[in-house]
C-alpha cells in the first residue's frame, strides 16, 4: 500500500492499524531548533483520544505519544521525527462475526477489491484511529509554526450536527473548550446533547460539519497554479476519514451570491490593506490574503450502527450484518482536533515553501 504521506517540505507519513501493536507518524522536514517534548504533543492528542465522555467511542486508549527520534536536548535536530502511539485497548473479538462480510458504508469492500486482502479488525488502516498519528504530527507542526510565525492561532469547532446548526449570533470562542462538542454555541451544545443521547441509545449515528479557522496567517502563502494553499488545504481535509465535502470561505454558497456581494472590498488601513468581508476565506488565487483562513468540512454519519443492514460476503452471497463493537455516534466530535492538525501541517508546509522561494521579500503596499 502506497500513498501514506502528505506534504511538500514538511512531509508526514503515517503508519499503523486500528488493532495493531502501535501506530504513528514519521515527520520529515521539520526545521531544526524547535523546542519540543512529548507533553506539548500530548496536549493535542488528549483532545482527540477516545472514551472521554458518553458521546464518543468507549474504547479506552491513553494515546500516550513517544518521540523516538529527531530530537536532542529538547529541540528538533532537522532529522526525521518518529512519533509512536501504542494501542492498548483493542477488542478484536468484536469483529469476528464480520470477517467474511463487508460493512455497508465502510472501506472494507474497496480495500478488498483493490488489495485482495483486508484487516477486518476495526477497519485496519482505514479506521479513524489512524488520525491519532496526524494529531501528533500536527502538535509538532504547531510548535514549529510558533518559531517561524508566532502570531498564528488555529481553532476548530463544530457548526452542525445532523440538521441542527449553531446560531452564529451566539458565537463565543470561549465556549468551544467548555462543552463535549467543541461548539461555540452553548445553547446548541445543550440541544445536541439531548439529540445525541437518543441516537446513541437507539444504536444510530449522525454526521456533522466542522469549521477550522487560522488567524494571524501572513499574506503570501501558497502559489499559483498547482500549489495553491486552498488546494492543499482541501486535499488535507478531504483525506480525513469520513469526510465527504470541503469548503473554503463561502464555499458552495458563493454560487448563490452576486459579484457585488461575493467580492471582498478593499481599503487602506493603518497597517496595510483591510477587507470589508471574508467571503474568500482568506485566500485569493491560491495565495493567502492576510485574513483569517476559513475551512469547513462535512463528516458523514458513522457507518457502524446497531441496525441490521443488507450486505454481501467475500464469496458473493447476500447476507445481513450488525456492526458490534465500540463506535462514535457522531465521529465529527473527534474530527475537530484532526482538522486543526491538518491545518497546522499545511500552514507550516507553506510557510517553509514561502521562505524557500521568496525569503523575506514580499510586495509592500502603502
Curated annotation (Swiss-Prot):
It catalyses: 5-O-(1-carboxyvinyl)-3-phosphoshikimate = chorismate + phosphate. InterPro entries: Chorismate_synth (IPR000453), Chorismate_synth_AroC_sf (IPR035904), Chorismate_synthase_CS (IPR020541). It holds the Pfam family Chorismate_synt. Reduced FMN (FMNH(2)). One of its GO terms (cellular component) is cytosol. One of its GO terms (biological process) is amino acid biosynthetic process. FMN binds at residues 125-127, 241-242, 285, 300-304, 326. Its cofactor is FMNH2. GO terms for molecular function: chorismate synthase activity; FMN binding. Belongs to the chorismate synthase family. This reaction introduces a second double bond into the aromatic ring system. This is Chorismate synthase. The gene is aroC.
Amino acid at each position: 500500500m502506497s500513498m501514506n504521506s502528505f506534504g511538500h517540505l514538511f512531509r508526514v507519513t503515517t503508519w499503523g492499524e486500528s488493532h495493531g501493536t502501535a501506530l504513528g507518524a514519521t515527520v520529515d522536514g521539520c526545521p531544526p531548533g524547535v523546542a519540543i517534548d512529548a507533553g506539548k504533543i500530548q496536549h493535542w492528542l488528549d483532545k482527540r483520544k477516545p472514551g472521554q465522555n458518553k458521546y464518543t467511542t468507549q474504547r479506552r486508549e491513553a494515546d500516550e505519544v513517544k518521540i523516538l527520534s529527531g530530537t536532542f536536548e529538547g529541540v528538533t535536530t532537522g532529522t526525521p521525527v518518529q512519533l509512536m502511539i501504542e494501542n492498548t485497548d483493542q477488542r478484536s473479538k468484536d469483529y469476528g462475526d464480520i470477517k467474511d462480510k463487508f460493512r455497508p458504508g465502510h472501506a472494507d469492500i474497496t480495500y478488498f477489491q483493490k488489495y485482495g486482502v483486508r484487516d477486518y479488525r476495526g477497519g485496519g488502516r482505514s479506521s479513524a484511529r489512524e488520525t491519532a498519528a496526524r494529531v501528533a504530527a500536527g502538535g509538532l507542526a504547531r510548535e514549529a509554526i510558533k518559531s517561524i510565525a508566532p502570531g498564528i492561532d488555529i481553532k476548530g469547532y463544530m457548526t452542525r450536527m445532523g440538521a441542527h446548526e449553531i446560531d452564529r449570533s451566539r458565537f463565543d470562542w470561549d465556549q468551544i473548550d467548555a462543552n463535549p462538542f467543541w461548539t461555540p454555541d452553548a445553547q446548541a451544545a445543550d440541544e445536541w446533547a439531548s439529540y445525541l443521547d437518543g441516537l446513541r441509545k437507539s444504536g444510530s449515528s449522525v454526521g456533522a460539519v466542522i469549521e477550522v479557522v487560522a488567524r494571524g496567517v501572513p499574506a503570501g502563502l501558497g502559489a499559483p497554479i498547482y500549489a495553491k494553499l486552498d488546494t492543499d488545504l482541501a486535499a488535507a481535509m478531504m483525506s480525513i476519514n469520513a469526510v465527504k465535502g470541503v469548503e473554503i470561505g463561502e464555499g458552495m454558497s458563493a454560487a448563490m451570491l452576486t459579484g457585488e456581494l461575493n467580492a471582498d472590498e478593499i481599503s487602506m488601513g493603518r497597517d496595510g490593506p483591510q477587507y470589508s468581508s471574508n467571503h474568500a476565506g482568506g485566500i485569493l488565487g491560491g495565495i493567502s490574503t492576510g485574513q483569517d483562513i476559513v475551512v469547513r468540512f462535512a463528516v458523514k454519519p458513522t457507518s457502524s450502527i446497531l441496525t441490521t443492514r443488507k450486505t454481501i460476503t467475500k464469496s458473493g452471497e447476500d447476507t445481513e450484518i450488525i456492526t458490534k463493537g465500540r463506535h462514535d455516534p457522531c465521529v465529527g466530535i473527534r474530527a475537530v482536533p484532526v482538522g486543526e492538525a491538518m491545518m497546522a501541517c499545511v500552514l507550516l508546509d507553506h510557510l517553509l515553501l514561502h521562505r524557500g522561494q521568496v525569503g523575506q521579500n514580499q510586495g509592500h503596499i502603502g
